[in-house]
Regions:
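Short, low-complexity N-terminal intrinsically disordered segments enriched in polar/charged residues
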Residues: 1-29, 135-138
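A structural feature that tracks compact, well-ordered secondary-structure segments
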Residues: 3, 11-15, 51, 68-69, ...
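A solvent-exposed, acidic/Ser-Thr-rich amphipathic alpha-helical stretch
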Residues: 6-8, 21, 25-75, 82-84
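A short, structured loop/turn motif at beta-sheet edges
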Residues: 70-78, 110-117
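Intrinsic, low-complexity N-terminal interaction/targeting segments
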Residues: 78-80, 92
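Short, well-ordered beta-to-alpha junction loops that form the rim of enzyme active sites
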Residues: 81-83, 121-122
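Exposed beta-sheet edge and beta->alpha loop/turn motif
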Residues: 86-112
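Low-complexity, intrinsically disordered terminal/linker segments enriched in charged
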Residues: 118-138
Length: 138
């Protein structure tokens, strides 16, 4: 039975929560990750894992994704919510605080041939930094 776009996205989210290191079961090798300033754009699964997923995983442990709503339209899925995590590693120059924080996000996923080919994401960095004691607006 063929999985729906939404099933693939939800399975990937569950794998990231479990901190599975090999993302190749969920993402194409030439996967594009396009994010707001602070995350940047990552071309290919290797760059995504090396330059975003691993540093994020190392900085924030005990992750739980609390996605509030999903939408699906053909080979596209979208969601918004937050990731609850404990800050236990360096993040954007901030030493570990041990704080449990919420990381707000919005994601748009494109699935091709049963794997994620593209992710457009917005992460609320001002909200993250404020929870870590850095108010960038003051």
């Amino acid at each position: 039975m063929t999985k729906t776009t939404l099933q693939i996205v939800k399975e990937m989210e569950q794998a990231l929560e479990r901190a599975e290191v090999d993302c190749s079961d969920y993402f194409h090798d030439d996967f594009d990750w396009v994010a707001n300033f602070g995350c940047g754009t990552k071309r290919g699964l290797d760059e995504f894992e090396r330059a975003w997923y691993k540093p994020f995983r190392d900085a924030f442990g005990d992750r739980h994704f609390a996605t509030e709503h999903y939408l699906e339209d053909g080979n596209w899925a979208a969601c918004f919510g937050h990731c609850e995590a404990t800050h236990h590693g360096d993040f954007m120059g901030i030493a570990p605080t041990g704080k449990r924080i919420k990381i707000p996000y919005i994601d748009f996923w494109r699935v091709e041939d049963g794997k994620i080919a593209e992710n457009r994401v917005s992460v609320d960095f001002p909200a993250i930094l404020a929870q870590l004691g850095q108010d960038i607006f003051n």
